[in-house]
Amino acid sequence: MSSNKVILYHANWSLCSQMVRVALYEKNIPFVSKHIKLCDQYPEGENINKKFLEINPLGTVPAIKINDDITCNSEEIIKKLNSITSDSNIDLYTIDNHESSSIIKETTITEGHKFASTIGTIIPVFSAPLIQHMVKKLPIKSILKILFNHPRRDRKYFFVAMYFFNFTKNLPKRLRYRK
């Protein structure tokens, strides 16, 4: 059994966080769960607080701390978890590395990939109505916090625009968020 101290910083709704949690459970690696209240869902916006930005300067989840080493990309986190010896003796990559890498790149929301070029990078298109619904419920104080504190210019402007404008009204009815 591994003697690593593992702390997972994650959000329940985050697809990438869910994938990392599955990997941890599959490998039977004990971990401490630190739920992060994301700025587009909660007024607290813990992912853009100074304390979390010291862990992940991009303000995104998941992030994992294994002993003193921090990794912030879900693809890299899963690779790192797979290298840890555990009592489950499970290999998360049951097919060759090239094929595994190809599947992971197609299905994760990975930084550096062109928007809508993979299944993972198209997901935000479908989740935008739900995100906008949550952003519009935030108090203006939270929107200002996003504007001044979010390290990612693209996300900060996107969330602020969602708050003040209605992007989803032009979507087909089946894609709009329903109460």
Where would I find each of the regions flagged by the language model?
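GST-like domain detector, emphasizing the conserved glutathione-binding G-site
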Residues: M1-R155
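Alpha-helix-centered segments that form part of catalytic cores
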Residues: L144-K179
